[in-house]
Amino acid sequence: MVNRQLVSPKSIVIVGGSDDTKKPGGNTLKNLLDTHYSGELFVVNPKADSAQGVRSYRRIEDIPPVECAILAIPAKLCPDTVDVLCTKKSCKAIIILSAGFHEDSPEGAELERRIAQRCNETGTSLIGPNCIGVMTPDYAGVFTHPIPKLTRQGAALISGSGATIVFILEAAMQLGLNFSQVFSVGNCAQIGVEEALQYMDESYEEGKSSKVIMLYIENISDPWKLYRHASSLIRKGVRIAAIKAGYSEAGSRAASSHTGAMASPDKAVDALFRKAGIIRCYSRNELVTVASALMYPTPKGKRFAIITHAGGPAVMQTD
């Protein structure tokens, strides 16, 4: 479930934030500062009283109530930290950047299960683990670069792969594409592509929400939910382009080792996308190109011209 505290938090704590911008916690803090996050900002670091000029608390128990927490600490420390945040600090949104969970080992899967259970019990939104974070017009809660221009009517991006987000942002920014929201869902312990899409459907406002949504999917855990909300958005005038990776046998194995994704038969994926109206793409460059084109109004009628420097590109454009 995606809530207001995840999308527009009034206060954020970086657990594991530091002066070291080569580490996820330190660079996430730097990104928040560089993009002028306007809410209250705290750090938890047992070895520091401040980080990049922001007050740091030695223990999670010492912080004031906070709306959103970004965790960049070892996986084994996350469950107890989440317990304190959810039960004692009124925290309703948690982003876990750390890896070492379901994608790594049975022991990691148990840590992830405990975290998801606590978040579900307390009505807390959970992104990750094993992700790069979240970006909205209100904050850039990620440890990566680049940070795109974030506007409410830019394209939205939901991805199970953090590195794919970085590639897409770099390519899209060269084409002048702006973004409204970026969700790196990682292992999808609670919120996956389907749940993020549900949020975009249920919060859609004509003239204010994104008209283009980009998806990178490794696992479709709830095909009906994906279909229901994708088709609903498309009926509202939103256009959706998606990559479903892991469609080959070898790719499916790679997806499983990456985020713990389960295989989905490729013919079923094709049928689902066609029925919903999702445009399927097969590469990151194709996804960026398609999304950039979709940002323009839909051409009407048959008075359409193609101008190129040579014949071959004209033939391909005609196709």
Which positions does each model-derived feature cover?
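Catalytic-core regions of core metabolic enzymes
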Residues: 1-319
